[in-house]
C-alpha cells in the first residue's frame, strides 16, 4: 500500500443549479437552468448555471441580462442553420439533435436554506468515512479531506476511496461531484479544477483527477 500523503478536494458540480434541477425531477446534466432572482431586475447576479447550459460557453456569475444576451446570440447562430424554430426547449440533448429548436432555459429563484440542507446531507456522507478533524470545509459545495490515514484503514487506493464517496453522493442526492487527488492540498485543488472538471464524466457519472509533483511538472 502506497504510504505517500494523499489529499482530496471535492466539488459539487454546479451545486445550486443541480439542486434546482433535481427538485424539478430534471437531469442537471441535460437541463438548461440558471439560478437567479428575476424579481431583482435583469441586473441580478446569476448564482449558478447548470452543466448543460455551461456547455454553451456560458459561465456562472454573469448578470441575468448578460445571460439573456448570450442566449440571443446563440439562437441567432442556430437560426443561420435552421432558418426557423419549431419550438423552444431547455432539454440539452434535444437541442443538440434538432437545430430547429430554440435554446431556452429555466430561471430558478435561489433557495439558500434548501441548498444548506443538501450540503448537510452530503457532509453526513463524508462523516461516515472520515473523522471531522480531517475534513476541511472550503465552502457550501467544496471540501478538502486528508486521506492519508484512511487508505490503510479501508485497504483501498485513494482513487477507489473517493470513487466510492462520489458514487454514494450521486446515489443519495443525484448530485454529480468532481474530485481531485494530490500529494498536497494545492495539487488536490489543481487536479480538481483543471483535470477533473475538464474531463468527461465516466460511465458511473464520476470525474476524478490526480496530480503528484512529477505529473504536475509534466502536465502543467
Language-model features: locations:
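Long, highly charged, low-complexity intrinsically disordered interaction regions
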Residues: 157-220
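Active-site-proximal beta-alpha loop/turn segments in soluble metabolic enzymes
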Residues: 143-152, 186, 220
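Short, surface-exposed alpha-helical recognition segments that flank or form part
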Residues: 114, 156-157
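Residues that scaffold, gate, or flank divalent-cation-dependent active/transport sites
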Residues: 1-140, 144, 151, 193-194
Amino acid at each position: 500500500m502506497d504510504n505517500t500523503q494523499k489529499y482530496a478536494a471535492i466539488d459539487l458540480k454546479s451545486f445550486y443549479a443541480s439542486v434546482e434541477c433535481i427538485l424539478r425531477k430534471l437531469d442537471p446534466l441535460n437541463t438548461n437552468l440558471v439560478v437567479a432572482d428575476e424579481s431583482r431586475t435583469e441586473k441580478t447576479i446569476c448564482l449558478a448555471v447548470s452543466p448543460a447550459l455551461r456547455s454553451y460557453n456560458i459561465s456562472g456569475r454573469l448578470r441575468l441580462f448578460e445571460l439573456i444576451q448570450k442566449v440571443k446570440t446563440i439562437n441567432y447562430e442556430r437560426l443561420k442553420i435552421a432558418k426557423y424554430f419549431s419550438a423552444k426547449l431547455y432539454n440539452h440533448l434535444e437541442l443538440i439533435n434538432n437545430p430547429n429548436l430554440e435554446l431556452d432555459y429555466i430561471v430558478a429563484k435561489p433557495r439558500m436554506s434548501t441548498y444548506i440542507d443538501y450540503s448537510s446531507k452530503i457532509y453526513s456522507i463524508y462523516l461516515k468515512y472520515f473523522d471531522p478533524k480531517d475534513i476541511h470545509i472550503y465552502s457550501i459545495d467544496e471540501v478538502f479531506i486528508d486521506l492519508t490515514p484512511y487508505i490503510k484503514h479501508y485497504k483501498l487506493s485513494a482513487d477507489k476511496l473517493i470513487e466510492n464517496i462520489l458514487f454514494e453522493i450521486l446515489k443519495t442526492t443525484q448530485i454529480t461531484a468532481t474530485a481531485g487527488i494530490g500529494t498536497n492540498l494545492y495539487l488536490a485543488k489543481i487536479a480538481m479544477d483543471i483535470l477533473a472538471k475538464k474531463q468527461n464524466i465516466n460511465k458511473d457519472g464520476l470525474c476524478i483527477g490526480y496530480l503528484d509533483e512529477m505529473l504536475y511538472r509534466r502536465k502543467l
